[in-house]
């Protein structure tokens, strides 16, 4: 089961609170519902590939409305295709849709009523329904951080984004596959959204994974930095040794001033050590790192002058 499926499973197991659960049902029907007409009556089909979501829609309808509804399973013949679960409402469809603010004067209303947008519990409930209907979230262990909710209507998509941003989630919108998405890419904001809609266990798992990823990234950056420093030291040491050998082969190390000669000999004898360690190995030492570095620069300048004079 994917991480997104785990999130939705947790959400479908949440207790239904009568005072705000209509907002969740409102989002589920607005985003996954399809209206048809048969025998001069409206029929509502609410479709999903997730059986737990279908059962939750069915329970919500039964809890709020005394209507004739049924749960239908359509098996797909193609390989690797999920079954399609349909909650069908045959009677009272226009009454239910009007009560939920989805149908007005026989026209579809693309956004939620104002009272939903201004009530904290209702906003959380609506966002939960919207995520169940059209949401997805990447596995934080293997992918880039990304959570999105797909909506068919642009105005509705912007409304979802506005709802999210009431809580500082920094969501953005864009068009996608004949519709629109609201998305979040910041890890902390994704965790905040999961907590907001009630997926507490999924949020805690997400945070654990995020913290471990951040720690691994910090360690990797530190290792890369240390490796870069080691390469820098190795390259500098190689150049120093090359110049010292040039001086020795050309005029002899005895031509160097005594203090430079001591450092040159010590470097040849201890080619792998750092400047700080080299300072403790010079006969006239210990010499500070900056002191050793100064003398090695003088040796390099001496070698460069020999090359110019050659």
From Swiss-Prot:
Keywords: Cell cycle, Cell division, DNA-binding
DNA-binding residues (ranges): 274-308
Gene Ontology biological process terms from the UniProt entry: cell division; regulation of sporulation
InterPro entries linked to this entry: Homing_endonucl (IPR027434), Sporu_reg_WhiA_N_dom (IPR018478), Sporulation_regulator_WhiA (IPR003802), Sporulation_regulator_WhiA_C (IPR023054), WhiA_LAGLIDADG_dom (IPR039518)
Molecular functions (GO terms): DNA binding
Classification via Pfam families: HTH_WhiA, LAGLIDADG_WhiA, WhiA_N
SUPFAM superfamilies (UniProt xref): Homing endonucleases (SSF55608)
Tagged with keyword Cell cycle: yes
PANTHER family: CELL DIVISION PROTEIN WHIA-RELATED (PTHR37307:SF1)
Family from the record: Belongs to the WhiA family.
Biological function: Involved in cell division and chromosome segregation.
Designated name of the protein: Probable cell division protein WhiA
Phylogenetic lineage: Bacteria, Bacillati, Bacillota, Bacilli, Lactobacillales
